[in-house]
Amino acid sequence: MRNVIRRVTTMTFTFLLQSPPLPISPSPPQFSLSSSPLSKTQRFITPSQGSRLRTLCTKVIIPNMQDSGSPPLSYLTQREAAEIDETLMGPLGFSIDQLMELAGLSVAASIAEVYKPEEYSRVLAICGPGNNGGDGLVAARHLHHFGYKPFICYPKRTAKPLYTGLVTQLDSLSVPFVSVEDLPDDLSKDFDVIVDAMFGFSFHGAPRPPFDDLIRRLVSLQNYEQTLQKHPVIVSVDIPSGWHVEEGDHEDGGIKPDMLVSLTAPKLCAKRFRGPHHFLGGRFVPPSVAEKYKLELPSYPGTSMCVRIGKPPKVDISAMRVNYVSPELLEEQVETDPTVQFRKWFDEAVAAGLRETNAMALSTANKDKKPSSRMVLLKGFDENGFVWFTNYESKKGSDLSENPSAALLFYWEILNRQVRIEGPVERIPESESENYFHSRPRGSQIGAIVSKQSSVVPGRHVLYDEYEELTKQYSDGSVIPKPKNWGGFRLKPNLFEFWQGQPSRLHDRLQYSLQDVNGNPAWKIHRLAP
């Protein structure tokens, strides 16, 4: 077994490296590097309209039933769970493989929400002979595609085509299958996550070999917690194996999973779950079923395949860290012009699916050197500088009138990248501000008139009332005048720093500084210690 694991772990399984190369448009539509005036040729940045990365799970907090004032949450009996399955696969037309695929994807999405592959890459899925085991096989396949390194222990294989097909799919991905005999004695040394997919809500009686021994081994891992030794986290699919479906772990000697992924709706035993992470998956319950069984369940936001139930665990902020895995940032590989290098990174961030790639932290200081920061949106850039728009009488506008220097910070988490830019700031010509103002949606134009930015208002209703009044005033489509105190700023860079996160905090930092070379300005690249 150790040789199998050793062979597989020599391969690099990170999400970034498994994904296809990020497409970079040779002629990005968001901006231009033309040296012509901004108002004539530089196209402003617009939000990305699509992404090839989809959110599979979004954290939504639903307080526990025990908490006062919490919303109701339904729990199913064993009989109700079976009836719902029969209804789904009967008159409602669902197939078993369809439900299994959705359930397994929900389990994988829940795991990926909490246990990132950079730190929890080695996953052992222990699968039973029934539908719960099938969910585990599907989850393992999705985890492989998410960048994890799954191993499968499937001691009692089912000969039905559905299950043999799932095995074939995993074989085609070279996912290793490990027998019970080949499992290491100490699971804590070879695995970071163990998926308990042995038994589901239809299980009765006591577990039989080899599952009784496997359950005991998972229970024994909990002893590591008492000795503060590192141990794999346990994720149970729908029911912690060995628990009574309704009464839970009534002898208090069973598996105590770190995560429970309830499917369709939580079963009664989930009331006794005390782990830090409880998720709901299986986004396929039709309204007719919810109404018949009076199901009160949290909503799945957006395109999410799972949703958190209960309060998230308390977090030790000092222990929060990410082990970055990224390509190296080398001097010989970057562009000599930092604006061109920024454009390349910006394109890659857009292609990676960031929602607001142009969001940046703008830091200013007033005449007394008192700093202030806020998030704003970059609206254009070229070799002449980086442009954003605001109210000149706002806090940032006031700071820049007193001290016309600023720093910008872009943070693109999904790529482990940051870019810092510093330099003097000036107002852009009024004509450019006028042109951009009238390119905005009419609602935004009216909003700029309504908002005397950073001034005190007695209530939100004041803004709404003025907005409604102006909307009626300009409902005929007439030109909305740009406020005199509204316009753009341009930062002319004299320093860039490109930061790429790396393992063990040995990050790459390349700084471009503008220097005088033979009477001409030139960019000099230095590597900075992390």
Swiss-Prot record:
Protein's UniProt keywords contain Cytoplasm: no
Additional facts recorded: Mutants with reduced expression of PPOX1 (RNAi) have lower levels of total B6 vitamers, a reduced growth and are sensitive to high light.
Tissue specificity of this protein: Expressed in leaves, stems, flowers and roots.
Transit peptide: 1-64
Residues reported to bind pyridoxal 5'-phosphate: E247, G248, D249, H250, V325, S326, P327, K379, Y436, R440, S444, R505, L506, H507
Triggers of expression: Circadian regulation. Up-regulated by light, heat, jasmonic acid, ethylene and abscisic acid treatments. Down-regulated by drought and salt treatment. Not induced by UV irradiation.
Record's keyword annotation contains Isomerase: yes
Chain ranges of the YjeF N-terminal domain: 81-297
A GO term, aspect molecular function: NAD(P)HX epimerase activity
Binding site for K(+): N132, D196, S241
Name of protein: Pyridoxine/pyridoxamine 5'-phosphate oxidase 1, chloroplastic
Annotated localization: Plastid, Chloroplast
NCBIfam families xref list: pdxH (TIGR00558), PRK05679.1 (NF004231), yjeF_nterm (TIGR00197)
Classification via Pfam families: PNP_phzG_C, PNPOx_N, YjeF_N
PROSITE patterns: PYRIDOX_OXIDASE, YJEF_N
EC number(s) from the headed UniProt entry: 1.4.3.5, 5.1.99.6
Residues the record lists as binding FMN: R374, M375, V376, L377, F389, T390, K395, K396, Q418, Q453, S454, W499, R509
Pathway assigned in UniProt: Cofactor metabolism; pyridoxal 5'-phosphate salvage; pyridoxal 5'-phosphate from pyridoxamine 5'-phosphate: step 1/1; Cofactor metabolism; pyridoxal 5'-phosphate salvage; pyridoxal 5'-phosphate from pyridoxine 5'-phosphate: step 1/1
Main localisation: plastid
Entry superkingdom: Eukaryota
Modified residues (N-acetylmethionine): M65
The entry's keywords: Acetylation, Chloroplast, Flavoprotein, FMN, Isomerase, Metal-binding, Multifunctional enzyme, NAD, Nucleotide-binding, Oxidoreductase, Plastid, Potassium, Pyridoxine biosynthesis, Transit peptide
Role according to the record: Catalyzes the oxidation of either pyridoxine 5'-phosphate (PNP) or pyridoxamine 5'-phosphate (PMP) into pyridoxal 5'-phosphate (PLP). Involved in the PLP salvage pathway. Has a higher preference for PNP over PMP. May also catalyze the epimerization of the S- and R-forms of NAD(P)HX, a damaged form of NAD(P)H that is a result of enzymatic or heat-dependent hydration. This is a prerequisite for the S-specific NAD(P)H-hydrate dehydratase to allow the repair of both epimers of NAD(P)HX.
Subunit record text: Homodimer.
